Structures are given as structure tokens and as C-alpha cells.
């Protein structure tokens, strides 16, 4: 029996022997949409996904679902935020995302399928030469986004009137475990919160189960909340 293993063992060294090829980088669309719609970015040939955030009592507080084309464009995106009583459902139609219910044009796109403008809120987005959204602006605020060499979002800085809010994330040094990270939130040069996340990963280096710890340092004593994130992901 052991001799039958030799061809596969040899193939492991030469080609990987049917191992899933891991894509370590994030596409501009995935990284940028994750910033704007507040979900963990995913890698590889994702076909559809659902991320569910649950509190310590197991109650769902937020759910994000999306379907993507083979080119990596979001064909649809749905956000359910129970804490803020918000529901957003978008479907792709040419150069716009329409409201899935009313079919009203909500988001204008640029390039292949990247964010360009949210007319109803007066928000416009700017991209860098690689297609990543690096700025968002309106009359009331300015936002700047940061990414690492693999396209992983490293945080953002928001300026509105006399307030500056900065979120800075530090991911794991292991490129496979990119969604294991810590983050610090600073408001007007004063630290007001921190976050720590640790996950289990699938063969595409995407998180399937995560623990998220959020500490609100803006109150005394600080308040710690523990959440669980469940991901279901289908691939092409």
C-alpha cells in the first residue's frame, strides 16, 4: 500500500497533489466593499457567502450576505443590522446597484464594478491606481482608507467638523491568518476602544468561525463584549 502513495508524495513536491491553491491577496472590490459595508473581506474564487455576527447569548445582531461573479464583482449584497435597525439589499444592474425591492438606483459604479458614488447621501469615492477605494467624501465628512501589500484593509480615518476618528488594524504576521487581528480606535487623539479577533480557517485561508472581542474604553469602567462570527462560503 505504501508504494501507491509515492506518486502522490512526489506530486506534492512538484505540483501540490490536488491541494487547493491559496490566494493570499484581496481584490480591490472585496476589500473596498468590506470597508463600506463592515464585514470581513474574503479571498479566492468566492461564489457566495454569509457572515453572521452573534452576541454572547447567541442572538444574531448582524448578517451580511453576498453573491459574486467569477470576475469578483458583487452581483448582490444584503446587510441586516439589528442593533441599528438597518436593512440594505442591493442588486447589480450595469453601472449601478439598485435597491432589491424598489429597483431605485442606489450606488453608481466605476471601472469594472467598483464604488463611485452614493447620490442620495452626496458621497463619492476615489480609487488608487490598483482600483482600491482610498477616499470617500461628502459635504459633512472625509474618509481615508489604508491597505497592506496584499490588499488587506488596515483601517480608516474619518474627519467630520471638529472630530477625527481613526481605526488602525494590525493583522497576524501569518499571511494565512489575516483575519486574526487587533485594532485600536482613537477619537481626537484619545483612545476610546480596542478590538481583538481570532479565527479558524478553511482551505482558501478564509475565516469560518471567529471570536470577536470589542472593548469600549470611552466609558469607565471599560465594557467588554464578546461576539461570535459564523461564515458560510461557497466557491467556484
Swiss-Prot record:
What subcellular locations does the record give?
A: Cell membrane
Here the disulfide bonds are none
Give me the residues lipidated as S-diacylglycerol cysteine: 17
Q: Does the keyword Membrane apply?
A: yes
Instruction: Extract the signal peptide range.
Output: 1-16
Presence of the UniProt keyword Signal in the record: yes
Keywords of the record, alphabetical order, are: Cell membrane, Lipoprotein, Membrane, Palmitate, Signal
Q: Which InterPro entries match?
A: UPF0257 (IPR010646)
Which superkingdom, per the lineage?
A: Bacteria
Give lipid-anchored residues (N-palmitoyl cysteine): 17
The record's section on HAMAP family has:
UPF0257 (MF_01065)
Q: Report the NCBIfam families cross-referenced here.
A: PRK02939.1
**Similarity comment: family membership:** Belongs to the UPF0257 family.
Supply the name of the protein.
Answer: UPF0257 lipoprotein YnfC
Organism, scientific name = Escherichia coli O17:K52:H18 (strain UMN026 / ExPEC)
Amino acid at each position: 500500500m505504501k508504494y501507491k502513495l509515492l506518486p502522490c508524495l512526489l506530486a506534492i513536491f512538484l505540483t501540490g497533489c490536488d491541494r487547493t491553491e491559496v490566494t493570499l491577496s484581496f481584490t480591490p472590490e472585496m476589500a473596498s466593499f468590506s470597508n463600506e459595508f463592515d464585514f470581513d473581506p474574503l479571498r479566492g474564487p468566492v461564489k457566495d457567502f454569509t457572515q453572521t455576527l452573534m452576541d454572547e447569548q447567541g442572538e444574531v445582531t448582524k448578517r451580511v450576505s453576498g453573491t459574486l461573479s467569477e470576475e469578483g464583482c458583487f452581483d448582490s449584497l444584503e446587510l441586516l443590522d439589528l442593533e441599528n435597525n438597518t436593512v440594505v439589499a442591493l442588486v447589480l444592474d450595469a453601472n449601478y446597484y439598485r435597491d432589491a425591492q424598489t429597483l431605485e438606483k442606489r450606488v453608481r459604479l466605476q471601472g469594472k464594478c467598483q464604488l463611485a458614488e452614493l447620490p442620495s447621501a452626496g458621497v463619492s469615492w476615489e480609487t488608487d491606481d490598483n482600483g482600491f477605494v482610498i477616499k470617500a467624501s461628502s459635504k459633512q465628512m472625509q474618509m481615508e482608507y489604508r491597505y497592506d501589500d496584499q490588499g488587506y484593509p488596515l483601517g480608516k480615518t474619518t474627519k467630520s467638523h471638529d472630530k477625527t476618528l481613526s481605526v488602525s488594524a494590525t493583522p497576524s504576521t501569518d499571511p494565512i491568518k489575516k483575519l486574526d487581528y487587533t485594532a485600536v480606535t482613537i477619537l481626537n487623539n484619545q483612545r476610546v476602544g480596542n478590538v481583538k479577533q481570532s479565527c479558524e480557517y478553511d482551505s482558501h485561508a478564509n475565516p469560518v468561525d471567529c471570536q470577536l472581542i470589542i472593548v469600549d474604553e470611552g466609558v469607565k469602567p471599560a465594557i467588554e463584549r464578546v461576539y461570535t462570527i459564523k461564515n458560510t462560503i461557497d466557491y467556484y
